[in-house]
């Protein structure tokens, strides 16, 4: 047996002979298969165990993520077996490594309509523990429009959010309240007020602030919304605070969401750790109730960061767009968190565009047609500050939320000054871009000139001018080119 032994299959048996038959011989590898428009396509990176042939390993992934088990079973004869089995139709080596990419097609009938939980259970639910593989990573998916249309998609989307807020032509600005844990509800609200009156559009609960003994959720929300309303009255702008509704049960999450709506909040938040079903459920509630939904990708790096095992974040981005979030954290390029330029730009394309072409440079293995589904607003947060504004706008574009937590609250002249510094930086950079200037090259000079009339910006740049997070990324694109499949 190829999977368990020395890589020599021996004499080929009948497909229906009792016992163990190599996955490739059972039809899970088919080099002649031409994927259908309606197939879900997957690209898996894998490292086989010694003695396991790459084609057999790819076939095993196709089998174990669809209909196969470890031995021949007679009940296969009671199904349209060839229709339902996953089909590995191509295996490519990754140059200079011991890794391979398996391209697998799944018939749409294998998946429940409109369910991220079912799709993820099918494709990644069991196969990642398979002993015949040293490692396995789901790199990308092509989700056909036929299946895309079974999902709600973003509760509102980028354009509707801008219309809600009446804010156009620039990135939106936010800040996560710091310290994330330990503040009283009243002091928490003071941070929100200072940041919003200083020029930010949003403030945010962090992923692990829910309802702890030092600050219960209801108390926090009352003070936060008082701060939001006061800042809106003073500035004449629509403002918001991401109220984190993540809780132990869906009943509690709905209770918190309803209270947020009662208080007049334009936005709520949920953590990725709440699970796919909870996220989809809250997205449906948000569309029904006219509330924006922010997703914090808490916990994602436990399975997205490593190069050879887990799930690439571009897959999570696709799933969350289908699930229906309006915002998702997707990397900064220049901040403290993992994400090289090309990977992050690939994530942003996945979230925002209506049609994405395959692009190996950005790590995009497949084309993706979103069938007019609204886009998701990517969020850049984690170790960014006003002095990087030219880089952020150049790399990430304007349909982005830039969140400066420490870069607002850590300002030497206080929270409002930190917010003002960020607002001035984005305004001058957008103006320069609109005037046709090369902001990537001229950005430092543009900021320096703005510092002459903005003491807040000058202090921010002076404080953080020497701060950088120049570490090599653990994951950069090396996609094996995948031809467009018509």
UniProtKB/Swiss-Prot annotation:
Enzyme class at the top of the EC tree: lyase
Superkingdom, taxonomy of origin: Bacteria
E.C. designation(s): 4.1.1.39
Spans traversing the lipid bilayer: none
Needed co-factor(s): Mg(2+)
Cofactor comment: Binds 1 Mg(2+) ion per subunit.
Residues annotated as the enzyme's active site: 178 (proton acceptor), 296 (proton acceptor)
Coiled coil, from the record: none
UniProt similarity note: Belongs to the RuBisCO large chain family. Type I subfamily.
The protein's name: Ribulose bisphosphate carboxylase large chain
PANTHER family, per database record: RIBULOSE BISPHOSPHATE CARBOXYLASE, RIBULOSE BISPHOSPHATE CARBOXYLASE LARGE CHAIN
GO terms under biological process: reductive pentose-phosphate cycle
Subunit structure comment from the entry: Heterohexadecamer of 8 large chains and 8 small chains.
Residues that, per the record, bind substrate: 126, 176, 180, 297, 329, 381
Gene3D superfamilies to which the protein is assigned, alphabetical: Ribulose bisphosphate carboxylase, large subunit, C-terminal domain, RuBisCO large subunit, N-terminal domain
GO molecular function: magnesium ion binding; monooxygenase activity; ribulose-bisphosphate carboxylase activity
Cross-referenced PROSITE patterns: RUBISCO_LARGE (PS00157)
Its biological purpose: RuBisCO catalyzes two reactions: the carboxylation of D-ribulose 1,5-bisphosphate, the primary event in carbon dioxide fixation, as well as the oxidative fragmentation of the pentose substrate. Both reactions occur simultaneously and in competition at the same active site.
Annotated site, Transition state stabilizer, chain positions: 336
Modified residues (N6-carboxylysine): 204
Keywords for this protein: Calvin cycle, Carbon dioxide fixation, Lyase, Magnesium, Metal-binding, Monooxygenase, Oxidoreductase
């Amino acid at each position: 047996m190829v999977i368990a032994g020395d890589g020599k299959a021996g004499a080929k048996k009948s497909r229906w002979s009792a016992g163990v038959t190599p996955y490739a011989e059972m039809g899970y590898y088919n080099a002649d298969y031409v994927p259908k428009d309606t197939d879900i396509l997957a690209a898996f990176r894998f490292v086989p165990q010694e003695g396991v042939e790459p084609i057999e390993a790819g076939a095993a992934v196709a089998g174990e993520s669809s209909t196969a088990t470890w031995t021949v079973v007679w009940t296969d004869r009671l199904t349209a077996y060839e229709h339902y089995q996953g089909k590995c139709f191509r295996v490519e080596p990754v140059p200079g490594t011991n890794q391979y990419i398996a391209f697998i097609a799944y018939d749409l009938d294998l998946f429940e309509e409109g369910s991220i939980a079912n799709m993820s259970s099918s494709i990644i639910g069991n196969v990642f523990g398979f002993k015949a593989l040293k490692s396995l990573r789901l790199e990308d998916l092509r989700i056909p429009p036929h299946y895309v249309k079974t999902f709600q998609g973003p509760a509102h989307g980028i354009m509707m959010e801008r219309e809600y807020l009446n804010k156009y032509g620039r990135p939106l600005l936010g800040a996560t309240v710091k310290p994330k844990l330990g503040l009283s509800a009243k002091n928490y609200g003071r941070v929100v007020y200072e940041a919003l009156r200083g020029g930010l559009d949003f403030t945010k609960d962090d992923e692990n602030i829910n309802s702890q003994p030092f600050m219960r959720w209801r108390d926090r929300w009352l003070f936060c919304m008082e701060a939001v309303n006061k800042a809106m009255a003073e500035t004449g702008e629509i403002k918001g605070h991401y109220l984190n509704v993540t809780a132990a049960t869906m009943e509690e999450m709905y209770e918190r969401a309803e209270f947020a709506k009662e208080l007049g909040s334009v936005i709520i938040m949920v953590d990725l750790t709440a699970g796919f079903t909870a996220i989809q459920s809250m997205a449906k509630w948000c569309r029904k109730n006219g509330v924006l939904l922010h997703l914090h990708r808490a916990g994602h790096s436990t399975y997205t960061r490593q190069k050879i095992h887990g799930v690439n974040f571009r897959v999570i981005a696709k799933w969350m767009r289908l699930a229906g979030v309006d915002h998702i954290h997707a990397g900064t390029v220049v901040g403290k968190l993992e994400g090289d330029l090309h990977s992050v730009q690939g994530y942003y394309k996945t979230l925002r565009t209506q049609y994405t072409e395959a692009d190996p440079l950005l790590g995009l293995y497949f084309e993706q047609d979103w069938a007019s589904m609204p886009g998701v607003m990517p969020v850049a947060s984690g170790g960014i500050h006003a002095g990087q504004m030219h880089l952020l706008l150049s790399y990430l574009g304007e349909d982005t939320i830039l969140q400066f937590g420490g870069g607002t609250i850590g300002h030497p002249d206080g929270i409002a000054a930190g917010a003002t510094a960020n607002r001035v930086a984005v305004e001058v950079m957008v103006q320069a871009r609109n005037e046709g200037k090369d902001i990537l090259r001229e950005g430092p000079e543009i900021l320096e000139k703005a510092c002459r009339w903005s003491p807040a910006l000058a202090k921010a740049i002076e404080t953080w001018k020497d701060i950088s997070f120049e570490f090599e990324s653990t994951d950069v694109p090396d996609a094996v080119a995948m031809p467009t499949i018509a």
